[in-house]
């Protein structure tokens, strides 16, 4: 029996040790290596996970279970506000940095009780690969922060869930700000208080967001309808962002919001089921969208578009892409969705000389992305 036990343990170790980065980043973050060939470590506590992610060593960190941060930093009860009403499906807001006081002075005041761990994510330092084993790697109640000059980071095959979903300003799933060479791949996010993904106002430089499942189903939302509003916010001052192969489901807005000075290549993504809008493009947002599928998205882009947008409207117009991207852009596909037709070409030269993700026909996306995006589908 002792030998059988030892063999079982050895088998588990061998299985765990087999976890490594799958594939390679396409697009702007091509070449990212994360922790490289560092010996994998397997945190067993939330404290170990925080330590591994936040130290100065190159690391491959493998998650084999759920790391639940709920309650680890206590709770706060304070006065917040109800900008969207007090119905049971409406999000309430924490008065973070006097947000309620300054921006929603007429909103009813309410008592809010939130988990402190969720309000600020785990710091991720440079040269890290954070990988999940199978479908078992979950971070619950706290997000990730890639900030302050961090670079060369891979986050792959994990889930981030349940971050104060009732409260705006309750926390973000993934924050990137003042960073470079970041690859977010096969990650599932669900039940998040604020943004599922946010690139802050400092330069995040080269970022690839691929094969992720952004799940906007929530019991609480700013639109009070079960559709999360705060999806993806790209607001950097000098950002090159590739979004490819993502499944963006059940949002009512900001999926994504693009502004600042952000060049976005949105290619082969699947947007499904929105009660509001998908794209919001502000000043300094430059968006090329090709080979995507929009299903049941009544408003694909909110008006007005204050930045620039190329929607790859037809095969003739799309030939202009060849000069700058090295291929003819793919048309997008639509099902029970609104219009999406704009052909600003002045910004396309910004793609010249960059690492550009390949593009497939939208018909491929329709059949493959929902079944292949997110954790455990790698």
From Swiss-Prot:
The cross-references to Pfam families, in alphabetical order and at most eight, read: Pectate_lyase_4 (PF00544)
InterPro entries membership: Pec_lyase, Pectin_lyas_fold, Pectin_lyase_fold/virulence, PEL
Q: Give the protein's biological function.
A: Pectinolytic enzymes consist of four classes of enzymes: pectin lyase, polygalacturonase, pectin methylesterase and rhamnogalacturonase. Among pectinolytic enzymes, pectin lyase is the most important in depolymerization of pectin, since it cleaves internal glycosidic bonds of highly methylated pectins.
Q: Give the species this sequence originates from.
A: Neosartorya fischeri (strain ATCC 1020 / DSM 3700 / CBS 544.65 / FGSC A1164 / JCM 1740 / NRRL 181 / WB 181) (Aspergillus fischerianus)
Residues bearing attached sugar chains per UniProt? 127
Source organism, top-level taxon: Eukaryota
Which GO molecular function terms does the record list?
A: pectate lyase activity; pectin lyase activity
The record's active-site residues are 254
Q: Which Gene3D superfamilies match?
A: Single-stranded right-handed beta-helix, Pectin lyase-like (2.160.20.10)
Its name, as the record gives it, is Probable pectin lyase A
Annotated GO biological processes are: cell wall organization; pectin catabolic process
Give the subcellular location: Secreted
Q: Is Glycoprotein a UniProt keyword of this protein? A: yes
Q: Which reaction does it catalyse?
A: Eliminative cleavage of (1->4)-alpha-D-galacturonan methyl ester to give oligosaccharides with 4-deoxy-6-O-methyl-alpha-D-galact-4-enuronosyl groups at their non-reducing ends
Listed SMART domains: Amb_all
Q: Which family is this sequence assigned to?
A: Belongs to the polysaccharide lyase 1 family.
Q: Specify whether Disulfide bond is a keyword of the entry.
A: yes
The signal peptide annotation in the UniProt record is 1-18
Query: One Gene Ontology cellular component annotation?
Result: extracellular region
Question: EC?
Answer: 4.2.2.10
- The main location is secreted
């Amino acid at each position: 029996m002792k030998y059988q036990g030892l063999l079982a343990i050895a088998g588990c170790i061998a299985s765990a040790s087999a976890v490594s980065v799958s594939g390679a980043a396409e697009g702007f973050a091509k070449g990212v290596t994360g922790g490289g060939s560092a010996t994998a470590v397997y945190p067993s506590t939330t404290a170990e996970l925080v330590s591994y992610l936040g130290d100065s060593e190159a690391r491959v960190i493998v998650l084999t279970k759920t790391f639940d941060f709920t309650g680890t930093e206590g709770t706060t009860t304070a006065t917040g506000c109800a900008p969207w009403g007090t119905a049971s499906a409406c999000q309430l807001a924490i008065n973070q940095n006097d947000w309620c006081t300054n921006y929603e002075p007429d909103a009813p005041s309410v008592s809010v009780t939130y988990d402190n761990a969720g309000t600020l994510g785990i710091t991720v330092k440079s040269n890290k690969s954070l990988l999940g084993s199978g479908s078992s790697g979950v971070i619950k109640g706290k997000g990730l922060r890639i900030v302050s000059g961090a670079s060369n980071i891979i986050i792959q095959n994990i889930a981030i869930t349940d971050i104060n979903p009732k409260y705006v300003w309750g926390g973000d799933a993934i924050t990137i700000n003042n960073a470079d060479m970041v690859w977010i791949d096969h990650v599932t996010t669900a039940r998040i208080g604020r943004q599922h993904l946010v690139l802050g106002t400092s330069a995040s430089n080269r970022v690839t967001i691929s094969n992720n499942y952004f799940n906007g189903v929530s019991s609480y939302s700013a639109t009070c309808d079960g559709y999360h509003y705060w999806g993806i916010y790209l607001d950097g001052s000098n950002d090159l962002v590739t979004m490819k192969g993502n499944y963006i489901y059940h949002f009512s807005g900001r999926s994504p919001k693009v502004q600042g000075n952000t060049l976005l290549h949105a290619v082969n993504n699947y947007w499904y089921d929105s009660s509001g809008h998908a794209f919001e493009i502000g000043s300094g947002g430059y968006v090329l969208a090709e080979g995507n599928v929009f299903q049941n998205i009544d408003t694909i882009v909110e008006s007005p578009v204050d930045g620039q947008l190329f929607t790859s409207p037809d095969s003739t117009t799309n030939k202009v892409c060849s000069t700058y991207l090295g291929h003819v852009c793919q048309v997008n596909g639509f099902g029970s969705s609104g219009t999406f037709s704009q052909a600003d070409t002045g910004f396309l030269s910004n793609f010249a000389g960059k690492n550009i993700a390949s593009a497939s026909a939208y018909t491929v996306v329709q059949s493959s992305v929902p079944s292949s995006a997110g954790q455990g589908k790698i």
